[in-house]
Amino acid sequence: MSACVAIIAALPREVKALVKGWESSSPARNVRVWTKGNAVVACAGMGADRVRLAVQAAMAAKPVTTLISAGVAGACDPRLRVGDVVHVGTVVDARTGERFEDPEYTQVLVTGAEVAGVAEKRRLFAAYGASAVDMEAAAVARLARAHGLSFAAVKAISDGAEFEMKELGRFATVDGQFREMAFAGYVAVRPWMWGRLMALAKNSDAAIAALTKELEAQLDWYRQRG
């Protein structure tokens, strides 16, 4: 069977540039799928529960052989900077302690249940030597194992280890979406947050640009494998 890679991300904005010009569909509410050749990208929202829907949609669209968990992530290692790409060697599920290993790489990604603030990033760095933290990779890895598929994870840093992000969690919906208008309204009446919001937007753009470049390179590699 030819290699067919499925990239699983949380939100469409993380892959918008990557999938420009691809065929797109929405098989269910807040589930988006894009296909091109032997590649598929799927998003269904933030968190482990939404990962299952994204993976199901990807596998329904193509005969998937590899799952890649991709997206932006928060740095736990203070040496990492915005736009740095993390090639994950170990995914740790913070809730269960499960580990998913890729011997090709060494960096550690911890998957948590909510957006991590500075204190949690510090704790994860101390406890696991974590490079970064996300909310989806462990669920993608678990589903890859269950279906006998290859797995990889690649993340781009959108917020440094000392950049506070915890309040973003209150704007996540039950189906893993981000309430952008509600967040904008929250910040609008808190002028002391405006500078941090502008930095967050700039940092997110830089992270997504780096992620897009990395994923394009990985897709080229899979295409060459045939």
Residue ranges of predicted features:
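Short N-terminal binding/cap micro-motifs at the start of the first secondary-structure element
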Residues: 14-18, 50
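Glycine-rich phosphate- or other oxyanion-binding loops that anchor nucleotides, phosphorylated ligands
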Residues: 28-226
